[in-house]
Amino acid sequence: MNYQKLGNTNLKVSTICLGTMTWGEQNSEPEGYEQMDLALDYGVNFWDTAELYSVPPRAETFGYTELIIGRWFKKTKNRDKVILATKVAGPARDYLRNGQNSFVGKNLEEALNGSLKRLKTDYIDLYQLHWPERNVNSFGKLGYKHDEEENEWNKIEDNDNPINAAITQNVV
């Protein structure tokens, strides 16, 4: 397996990343366990998940993929062998955090804490915003006109306080 340095960190990630978005919906928990075991056997140490998974997203399966990974970590004690990436879901799912899913402090903090609990870990190696939260033309919307004065969307720079706090505390 080939490995690359992750950004400006000292983490070495496999050039193949294990995607997990179907676990709990299209794939069973035992199948997820089998894939995780096989990934480590072949040196795949970079794994990607998200609070939104499994896919297709539904309120009933929200966070389920993270739960599967967390149970596997608890069972195998292999958390230290994995470079784990997860994502906070942005706008679009009203069942997330009671519809409070914009990228602002309390929502980011609640999402991060939920992921940590489901994943049964005290740190996440790479924490990402799943969707941009900006007022842009998306999914084929016709006739979109950008308004420079539009202030209802958060700027990405405004989102870093809870994330920086988590980085300082070695949670992310």
Task: Cite the ranges covered by each PLM segment.
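Conserved catalytic core of Hanks-type protein kinase domains
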Residues: 39, 87, 118
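Glycine/proline-rich, positively charged
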Residues: 95-172
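Glycine/Thr-rich phosphate-binding loops of Rossmann-like dinucleotide-binding domains
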Residues: 26, 55-57, 94, 134-137
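N-terminal binding-site loop/beta-alpha segment at the start of enzyme catalytic domains
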Residues: 1-83, 122
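A short alpha-helix capping/helix-coil boundary motif
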Residues: 12-16, 91-95, 147
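Surface-exposed, interaction-prone regions with an acidic/low-complexity signature
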Residues: 85, 91-93, 99
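Generic beta-strand or strand-like secondary-structure segments
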Residues: 68-72, 87, 107-114
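Active-site beta-loop-alpha junctions enriched in small/polar residues
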Residues: 21-23, 52, 87-91, 129-132
